From Swiss-Prot:
Disulfide-linked positions: C96-C188
UniProt xrefs under PANTHER family: G-PROTEIN COUPLED RECEPTOR, OLFACTORY RECEPTOR
Subcellular locations according to the entry: Cell membrane
CDD domains: 7tmA_OR6N-like
GO CC, alphabetical: membrane; plasma membrane
Function: Odorant receptor.
Keyword Kinase recorded: no
Residues carrying covalently attached carbohydrate according to the record: N5
Name recorded for this polypeptide: Olfactory receptor 6K2
Domain of life: Eukaryota
Length: 324
């Protein structure tokens, strides 16, 4: 009896978007600006790190990798949000599974990478003499690849299980993109589905709590070392090295924790969407700002390249002919 019902739903319809054309346009314009800023801002960071050899250090290698992940993390959801605001609000069942997979896989990659970055800061401040011999370029590459492997493997069992569930009721998804809990609510309710929802909650809890504990352990050691530094300038330098990462960590994990560590707690649709926007849109939006405005070396490198671009474009067409 399940197979006929299962095939009745071939697509989901996002019902959380405004139906008014004016409201849709009002939402579309800032979202388009934010997405463009995220892509361009992160591409600038990647390019600046690649073009400046003095930035080829573990910290900037990880920042560059995080910027690359941010582009794909937002691309998994925002383009579909933009099209849903102005046109068709449906997504195929397979498309929904793919969106969930890439959104969560890139998100888990970021969680792992933020944890690795905290460990990198810990080594740089707590073991500065051994740091160059430990955090080699080879190890940086291995850690980055390990984060990606972990991220792209972890969601596979959940996605595979959801693909086997029967969906025999409403296909109206009360969310702005495909996510585990909103999709699971549309599955035909049975004991197995209820138990698996709880299992998904536990999996998310383990992932988030493990990462948060490791990061806080790293920062606990960092703070202890910083407090032992006698020079105020030295303390300021050491603190500024970590503050950008900690702000990014707080923004991302704060909203993710509210969304995925609620267990039986329920929010209104408004708060569900607000929290989802916080970690899917706003957190990636602030990351390029934090890493560029709070990082002296990246700011100086960007200014240098802007200056070079101004010189290049200020050369008049007749100048080259005069040289020859």
């Amino acid at each position: 009896m399940e197979s006929p019902n299962r095939t009745t739903i071939q697509e989901f319809i996002f019902s959380a978007f405004p139906y008014s054309w004016v409201k849709s346009v009002v939402c579309f314009v800032p979202l388009l600006f934010i997405y463009a800023f995220i892509v361009v801002g992160n591409l600038v960071i990647i390019t600046v790190v690649q073009l400046n050899t003095h930035l080829h250090t573990p910290m900037y290698t990880f920042i560059s990798a995080l910027s690359f992940l941010e582009i794909w993390y937002t691309t998994a959801t925002i383009p579909k949000m933009l099209s849903s605001l102005l046109s068709e609000r449906s997504i195929s069942f397979n498309g929904c599974l793919l969106q969930m997979y890439f959104f969560h896989s890139t998100g888990i990659c970021e969680v792992c990478l933020l944890t690795v970055m905290a460990f990198d800061h810990y080594l740089a401040i707590c073991s500065p003499l051994h740091y160059p011999s430990i955090m080699t370029p080879k190890l940086c590459t291995q850690l980055t690849l390990s984060c990606c492997v972990c991220g792209f493997i972890t969601p596979l069992p959940e996605i595979a299980w959801i693909s086997t569930l029967p969906f025999c009721g409403s296909n109206h998804l009360e969310h702005i993109f495909c996510d585990f809990l909103p999709v699971l609510r549309l599955a035909c309710t049975d004991t197995r589905a209820i138990v698996m929802i709880q299992v998904v909650d536990v999996i998310h809890a383990v992932e988030i709590i493990t990462a948060v504990m490791l990061i806080f352990m790293s920062y606990d050691g960092i703070v202890a070392v910083i407090l032992r530094i006698h020079s105020a300038g030295g303390r300021r330098t050491a603190f500024s090295t970590c503050v950008s990462h900690f702000i990014v960590f707080s923004l991302f994990f704060g909203s993710v924790t509210l969304m995925y560590l609620r267990f039986s707690a329920t929010y209104s649709l408004f708060w569900d969407i607000a929290i989802a926007l916080a970690f899917a849109v706003l957190s990636p939006f602030f990351n390029p700002i934090i890493y560029s405005l709070r990082n002296k070396e990246i700011k100086e490198a960007i200014k240098k390249h802007i200056g070079q671009a101004k010189i290049f474009f200020s050369v008049r067409p007749g100048t080259s002919s005069k040289i020859f």
